[in-house]
C-alpha cells in the first residue's frame, strides 16, 4: 500500500485533493493511504509516508522538510500548482508516485 502525506498551512485546503486522489487510486485498482495535515504536524507524520506533497503556500519550507525526510529516505515536493488549484487527484497522485520510483 502506498502512503502519501499532503501538508498545507492548516491541512484544510488539501482535504479535497486527498479525496480526489483516493478516488483516483481506487479507480485504477491501487490501495493507497492518503492523508492531510497542517504544517505543524508534517515532520511528525512524514515518517509514516512513502512520499510527501506540500501545498504551494508552503514551498518556502521545502528544503527544511526535505532535510527531515532524508532520514526516512522519502522525497518532498511542492504540489503541482494546476493540480492543486483544480483539485486534480489524478495529476497529484501521479506526482506522488513519481517520488516513490527510487524506493
Curated annotation (Swiss-Prot):
Family annotation (Gene3D superfamilies): 3.40.50.2300
PTM sites of type Phosphocysteine: 8
Domain of life: Bacteria
Enzyme class: transferase
PROSITE patterns with a match to the protein in the record: PTS_EIIB_TYPE_3
GO molecular function, one term: kinase activity
InterPro entries named among the record's database cross-references: PTS_EIIB-like_sf (IPR036095), PTS_EIIB_2/3 (IPR003501), PTS_EIIB_3 (IPR013012), PTS_sugar-specific_EIIB (IPR051819)
Pfam families, A to Z: PTS_IIB
GO cellular component annotations of the record: cytoplasm
EC number per UniProt: 2.7.1.205
Keywords: Cytoplasm, Kinase, Phosphoprotein, Phosphotransferase system, Polysaccharide transport, Sugar transport, Transferase, Transport
Subcellular location(s) of the protein: Cytoplasm
Domain PTS EIIB type-3: 1-103
Induction summary: Up-regulated by konjac glucomannan and by cellobiose and mannobiose, the possible degradation products of glucomannan. Repressed by glucose via the carbon catabolite repression system. Also repressed by GmuR.
Active site: 8 (phosphocysteine intermediate)
Reaction catalysed by this enzyme: D-cellobiose(out) + N(pros)-phospho-L-histidyl-[protein] = 6-phospho-beta-D-glucosyl-(1->4)-D-glucose(in) + L-histidyl-[protein]
Keyword Transport in record: yes
Example of a GO biological process term: polysaccharide transport
Annotated domain remarks: The PTS EIIB type-3 domain is phosphorylated by phospho-EIIA on a cysteinyl residue. Then, it transfers the phosphoryl group to the sugar substrate concomitantly with the sugar uptake processed by the PTS EIIC type-3 domain.
Role this protein plays: The phosphoenolpyruvate-dependent sugar phosphotransferase system (sugar PTS), a major carbohydrate active transport system, catalyzes the phosphorylation of incoming sugar substrates concomitantly with their translocation across the cell membrane. The enzyme II GmuABC PTS system is involved in the transport of oligo-glucomannans such as cellobiose or mannobiose.
Name of protein: PTS system oligo-beta-mannoside-specific EIIB component
Lineage, uppermost ranks: Bacteria, Bacillati, Bacillota, Bacilli, Bacillales
